[in-house]
């Protein structure tokens, strides 16, 4: 999954596409991720796990959790290769801008982010996300 970015106001949704063959071919057209609405801001995407058998893979996205401001840092999860983002966890309630994500041993997730402005960095480690989407059996 490639995050094409956000063209800026008035559009607030991230655009995504699938790239295959080592990055040489676009496998799909672009689509908007309805759940990833936010003020124009760099976010981070990281693969937490690959699909295996009947178990879905998990993509993570970190960015502002609100549409109107760089605030409420939120980690989101997609279990269908970026089509939907049903799982989310807020990691910081205040000002939260650019971020990066890293999957740690055991599945926990580290997030480094701009905290309360561009002069401060925040860092947090979150528990491993659920292996299945919310409501799955």
Task: Identify the role of each PLM range.
Residues 1-137:
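Asp-box/BNR beta-propeller blade signature and adjacent active/binding-site loops
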């Amino acid at each position: 999954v490639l995050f094409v970015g956000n063209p800026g106001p008035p559009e607030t949704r991230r655009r995504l596409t699938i790239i295959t063959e080592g990055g040489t071919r676009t496998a799909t057209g672009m689509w908007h991720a309805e759940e990833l609405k936010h003020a124009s801001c760099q976010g981070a995407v990281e693969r937490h796990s690959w699909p295996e058998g009947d178990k879905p893979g998990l993509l993570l996205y970190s960015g502002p959790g609100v549409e109107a401001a760089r605030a409420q840092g939120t980690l989101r999860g997609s279990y269908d290769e970026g089509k939907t983002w049903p799982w989310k966890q807020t990691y910081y309630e205040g000002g939260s801008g650019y971020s990066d994500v890293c999957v740690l041993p055991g599945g926990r997730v580290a997030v480094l982010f701009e905290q309360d402005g561009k002069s401060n960095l925040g860092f947090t480690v979150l528990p491993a996300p659920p292996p299945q989407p919310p409501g799955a059996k």
